[in-house]
């Protein structure tokens, strides 16, 4: 009985622990995003689907770009002065929202032109950037709650998002909605309404601090942002190039990209969680972390291969057009994202050891390499899987180089024995 009680207590503790709640909440959010991606070919007409899925993919990408630097910066600095850095965080996030709303007011803004999401209607353009702003509301609120260890609040917020999105998908399917604005309003804005309330509450509660250290906070955040933007943009080069050549293939690539949402969310989740825990001054915690990541390797890659096999089989049988080609694109995307997620468990420590300048250089070289490959290798719809695989291999190679750089830096510091 005593053993049974201990086992039950341990399971209960694991299930209600901070990391478990965090993983569950973010997996649920990823599931809601994945369902939008997976069901949209079947609940939307072909023309509406190809337009929507490309824009939706870019909304998710813009969310990553605008949020990539601020949340890690907050998690790194929060432990030093909670009051001051909460103030800086909310101030910066407010500026981000203002920039997005401003972009929404200009149909011919350069960002839309680069991403090939320019609309003829001001209302459609505005609702795209409003969707990005509401999505970022969730990301920024989650970052603040993570710093405050309020994981139950994160879970409640994501359950609300999940339920509203499911209802929205049912209504879109049942009513055969084709209006672009209404679709985005249903799946990208209304589900995050509560996040706007949470943000306003945080702003009203914050104690405003002097801005004497805001420059250092901002510089660190800008460095992380540039690193993240380069990485995210590198992944988009092939998609944007494809959009200019073949809209159907661009839709297929956007669909494939949507399937890796759970890995991307898991990556963000793990990075956010561990950035708040890892400290360069604590040798034991760094060594323990590296040991855990190493032990995790075999099981992780076995699971990744199983998932890739299952996804290939499912897509091959359900995707409405060019199923074989789309299935292979999905597998390549999953492998690339899955491998980079694991490598990223090492490379995230560039922030812990302040190696951002070196990572910035590597990401810049990676961006340039992919740009050259995409620009000068003739595009062929017949060999799109091979071309996409080559681009993915280049990205993985540079991420490996960043991880290697981090491990070499740790070894050179002679803080951890045996590396």
Language-model features: locations:
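Interfacial segments at transmembrane-helix termini and the short loops linking adjacent helices
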Residues: 46-47, 109-128, 310-344, 417
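Membrane-water interface segments that mark the loop-to-transmembrane alpha-helix transition
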Residues: 17-29, 55-109, 123-125, 283-308
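Helix-loop junctions and terminal segments of transmembrane helices
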Residues: 37, 64-81, 260-284, 351-352
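Small-residue hotspots at the loop-to-helix junctions and early N-terminal turns
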Residues: 49-57, 125, 247-262, 327-330
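Interhelical loop/hinge segments that connect adjacent transmembrane helices in multipass membrane
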Residues: 2-14, 117-123, 152-156, 176-188, ...
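Transmembrane helical elements of multi-pass membrane transporters/channels
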Residues: 18-33, 37, 160-161, 183-202, ...
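Hydrophobic alpha-helical transmembrane segments
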Residues: 126, 155-204, 365-369, 381-408
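Membrane-interface junctions at transmembrane-helix termini in multi-pass inner-membrane proteins
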Residues: 77, 133-156, 335-362
């Amino acid at each position: 009985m005593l053993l049974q009680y201990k086992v039950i207590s341990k399971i209960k503790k694991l299930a209600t622990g901070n990391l478990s709640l965090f993983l569950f909440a973010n997996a649920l959010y990823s599931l809601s995003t994945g369902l939008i991606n997976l069901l949209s070919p079947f609940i939307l007409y072909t023309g509406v689907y190809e337009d929507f899925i490309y824009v939706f993919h870019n909304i998710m990408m813009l969310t990553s770009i605008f949020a990539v630097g601020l949340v890690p910066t907050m998690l790194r600095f929060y432990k030093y002065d909670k009051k001051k850095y909460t103030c800086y965080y909310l101030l910066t996030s407010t500026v981000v929202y203002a920039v997005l709303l401003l972009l929404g007011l200009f149909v011919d803004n350069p960002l839309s032109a680069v991403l090939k999401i320019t609309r003829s209607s001001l209302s459609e353009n505005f609702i795209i950037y409003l969707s990005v702003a509401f999505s970022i509301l969730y990301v920024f609120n989650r970052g603040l709650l993570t710093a405050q260890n309020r994981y139950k609040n994160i879970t409640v917020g994501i359950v609300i998002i999940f339920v509203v999105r499911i209802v929205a998908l049912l209504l879109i399917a049942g009513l055969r909605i084709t209006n672009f604005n209404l679709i985005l309003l249903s799946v990208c804005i209304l589900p995050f309404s509560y996040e706007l309330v949470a943000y306003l509450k945080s702003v009203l509660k914050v104690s405003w601090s002097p801005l004497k250290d805001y420059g250092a906070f901002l510089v660190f955040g800008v460095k992380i942002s540039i690193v993240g933007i380069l990485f995210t943009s590198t992944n988009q080069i092939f998609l944007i190039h494809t959009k200019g050549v073949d809209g159907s293939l661009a839709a297929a690539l956007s669909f494939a990209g949507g399937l890796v949402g759970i890995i991307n969310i898991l990556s963000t989740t793990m990075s956010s969680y561990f950035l708040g825990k890892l400290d360069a001054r604590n040798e034991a915690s760094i060594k323990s972390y590296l040991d855990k990541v190493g032990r995790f390797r075999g099981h992780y890659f076995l699971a990744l291969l199983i998932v890739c096999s299952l996804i290939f089989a499912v897509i091959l049988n359900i995707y409405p057009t060019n199923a074989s080609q789309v299935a292979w694109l999905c597998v390549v995307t999953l492998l690339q994202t899955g491998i980079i997620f694991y490598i990223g468990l090492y490379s995230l420590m560039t922030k812990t050891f302040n190696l951002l300048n070196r990572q910035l250089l590597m990401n810049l070289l990676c961006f340039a390499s992919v740009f050259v490959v995409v620009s000068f290798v003739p595009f062929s719809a017949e060999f799109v899987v091979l071309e996409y695989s080559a681009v993915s291999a280049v990205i993985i190679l540079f991420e490996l180089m960043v991880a290697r750089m981090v491990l070499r830096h740790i070894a050179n510091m002679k803080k951890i024995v045996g590396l």
